[in-house]
Amino acid sequence: MNLTTDPWIPVLWNDGATRAATLTDIFVRGHDIRDLAVRPHERIALLRLFLCVAHAALDGPGDREEWQDCLAGLPAAARDYLQLWAPAFELFGDGQRFLQVPNLKAAKAKDDEGNSVSKLDMALATGNNPTLFDNSGGDGRAFPPEQLASLLLTFQCFSPGGTIGVALWDCKPTPGWKSYPKPAPGQSSHAPCLPGSMLHAFPRGANLLATIHLNLVTRDAVVTLPGITDLGRPVWEQMPSSPADKAFLTNATQTYLGRLVPISRAIRLESGGRGLLLANGVDYPSWPEAREASATIIVRTIKGQPDRYVLSASLDKAPWRELHALTVKSAFVKDAGGPLALNNLDGNQPFDLWVGSLVADKAKVLDTVEGVYHVPAAMLVSTGQQRYADGVQLAEQTAWALKRAVTRYHAEVGDKLDRPDARNRRDALQNKAAFQFWTQAERELPLLLAAVQSADPLPDAAAWKRSGWGHTVHQAARVAYETACPHETGRQLQAFVKGLAILFPNSANHSN
């Protein structure tokens, strides 16, 4: 199977149909493709591949002027480039293979470490992975070649670090094999897209080709990224021959294109597609030594000391609550800010922003998050970002009050949730109410974005509470509280009023 000519990428076409596209189709027919039809972490990996091909085909763009002029010539340039490098995109065969290192051999004659290709799908219940989307356990699954291609690419971008098998790469031990030559499990670091469960963000265009163009980063911007020395070349052009291939390893780890499509794991697929040889590959520095262009860097003060951190995804906090950080243009804040592609946007027009992440706890994959938001141009300036942050803060303060109100209600009905042995139940009751609140608040997100664009003054919390967003937050909290706290009996009603006073302390009449 060749990724340039065989269909393997699930996409949504403009006619509404979902069909697989070839890598060449992505560029030549990209104006007919509305969007990708994949999971969040797969989207991130695929977009990185598309951007890598586009940059390599253009050998740039060097600056903003080149970026503005390159869209028209991108389809032909990418088509010619993929024809030239087509042999590097073979999934199987005796020659060069896509994202598979050469001359990889098992550490011992009968190596039973990690043979199943199901290890490539982090959503399956295999090894240490929890079941996210899978209902059938066990190894030995068979995957069609088109799915294997996507799994391989995504695994190289997101594989969590930890214990891993070992192998010989051109007769040399794979990185992390500390017991060499004794065959024992090795160690690996996170692949470059995973550290900190970072949120990735990409501005979205009218079609897939426009999205690719919108996310191209100029060479003069690339070299400002920590840990990046140059635009570089894709890893398939300079595939390291062994762990000692310093020149090609430097390209893979310290250049923009080398990192976009990584080889974080040393992999060799069996010809039948059921098994693989898997070991640690190339170690990629992460923040603060290196930064991904799609990540957001924020300033956070801990113990009185401000420092810069990668903005992380959370299963308890939807991405829309971080939009004020995600939309800061990096050009305006040294080392901090949102994705570099924001600098390509017209500051006078609204835009769509896709945000997503694979969330992990150390080596354990937990789940994915994603969201698509229609963002007003006002969010690209500090005044709009601050106003949005104030609106989110109002909601977060209300959510915290809701949790305390639920606890007070239960205390008044004789259910003391502040006892140490009741902690888990208290958290469950509070989180259930908070989940309902945040779900309703997110449905009304356009009201918050409208407040960002509004000329109405919102100088303080009282003004925010009188706004359309403030009324929505109030109503969402009231409904969530009523659902969580029954108020039918006399005692329940008294407890309900006591809790309501916690939720809305300044309300003249808590019973309304």
Predicted regions, residues:
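Extended alpha-helical scaffolding segments
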Residues: 1-127, 159-160, 164-165, 170-512
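Beta-strand elements of modular eukaryotic interaction domains
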Residues: 132-134
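Flanking scaffold residues of small Cys/His-coordinated metal-binding clusters
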Residues: 136-139
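Short Cys/His-rich metal-coordination motifs, predominantly Zn2+-binding knuckles/fingers
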Residues: 144-147
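Short, non-ligating residues that shape and space the ligands of small metal-coordination modules
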Residues: 150-154
